[in-house]
Each structure stands twice: as structure tokens, then as C-alpha cells.
Amino acid sequence: MDKMLLLLGVSILLSEVFAQTDLTGKVFVFPRESESDYVKLIPRLEKPLENFTLCFRTYTDLSRPHSLFSYNTKNKDNELLIYKERMGEYGLYIENLGAIVRGVEEFASPVHFCTSWESSSGIAEFWVNGIPWVKKGLKKGYTVKTQPSIILGQEQDNYGGGFDKSQSFVGEMGDLNMWDSVLTPEEIKSVYEGSWLEANILDWRTLNYEMSGYAVIRPRCVALSSYNKIS
């Protein structure tokens, strides 16, 4: 009986740490600045990326720089990184080379962010709350490598670690999806408005993840209409 209870306890603990879950209507909450709180995402990725689109929603009152999506490989720091430099300024980094985009944004307001990149042209596109921002170009002809460590809540300085709390994310993050293609403007708008478009790398409805430290899952309290109001 004791062994059965022990196994049951371990099973429950593991289910809280590692899970594949439909997170529709929910968010990851990172409630404090730290170097220990994060969520690791496990992608469905078998070959290098020649194209991608990544979308997610965030809600934070941070004014300092912070990481939004950190994708490292064993041989490359910042193989793919989304970094918020300051209010109204985002950076997309591929193999440590960055493209910075700037636009109008309200402080402490919910944000829906999308970025796409195409290897053949090197063109990166950015969308904030359904509005296209200026296109940039970087790493034409490159392919983003596989077997990544993908971290939300922290910026990796090495594979799966090297965190600095001054770069940590504090707030809510949800509706994160990643495709191995460049979505059309119509598809971006549809996703922004709350429609579901099945994603083949990371899908919020079938997400594999591991939670570490003080990161929790809660119902999303910010209505989708709130994103529409500020666009």
C-alpha cells in the first residue's frame, strides 16, 4: 500500500511538472522577477527551419528589457530569440544577429505579437495587436537549427540555463503557437482575433511543456476584446 501511494504521489507530481495539455483560455503566469522560474516547451520539430511564424499574447507591466521566447541549441546561443528591448521596441534574433522593430504601444496593456521569417529572402515581418510593423531583413539563406531548448520566462545564455533575473519575464503569456511556414496577413489577423489555426511546431491546444520554479497556470482574465481596443 505504501509503495502504491508513493507511486501515485510521484505520478501526480510529474503530471504537474511535465504535461501535454489543451491550454485554451489559460495563461502561464510568471509572478515575480527571478532566475529560477520558467517553462520549457517541447516542440514537434524534425528538420531545420527555413521559414516560421510565431504568435503569442502577453500582459506585463515591465518597463525594463526582457525575454519573451528563448530558443537555444547546444552549439548556438540565441539561435532564435524574441526580446522586448523597451516599450514599443522588439528584437528578433537569429543566430545572434538581431533585427529591431519599433512602433506605438501603450504601457501595461495586453499585447498580441506575431513575427515571421523567410530564409529565401531573409525578410522578417512583425505584427502587434493585428497591426503590421516595419519589415526587416536578416540571415538570408540561413536555416534555424533543430534540437532546441525553448524557454519562456528567462533568456538562456547557454543550453537550458545561464539565466539572469534582470532579463526575466514577469506577467502572463498565452496562446503561443509556432508554424514552419510564413502565415498570410489574413491568417495573422484571424489568429489575432482569436481563431484557431492548427500549428505544427508548437500548438497551444496540444502543448508539451515542463514547469520549473514559481510558474503557474491560470485562466486568462484579459478578454480578447481588450487586444482589439488598443490596436
UniProtKB/Swiss-Prot annotation:
Chain coiled-coil ranges: none
One Pfam family in the UniProt entry: Pentaxin
Residues annotated as binding Ca(2+) 2: 155, 157, 167
Record's signal peptide: 1-19
GO BP terms in the entry: acute-phase response; innate immune response
Pentraxin (PTX) domain sequence ranges: 24-223
Keywords: Acute phase, Calcium, Disulfide bond, Glycoprotein, Metal-binding, Secreted, Signal
Tree of life domain: Eukaryota
Intrachain S-S bonds: 55-114
Known cofactor(s): Ca(2+)
Gene Ontology MF term list: complement component C1q complex binding; metal ion binding
InterPro entries named among the record's database cross-references: ConA-like_dom_sf, Pentaxin_CS, Pentraxin-related, Pentraxin_domain
Other known facts: Plasma concentration of FP are altered by sex steroids and by stimuli that elicit an acute phase response.
Protein's recorded name: Female protein
Organism from which the protein derives: Nothocricetulus migratorius (Gray dwarf hamster)
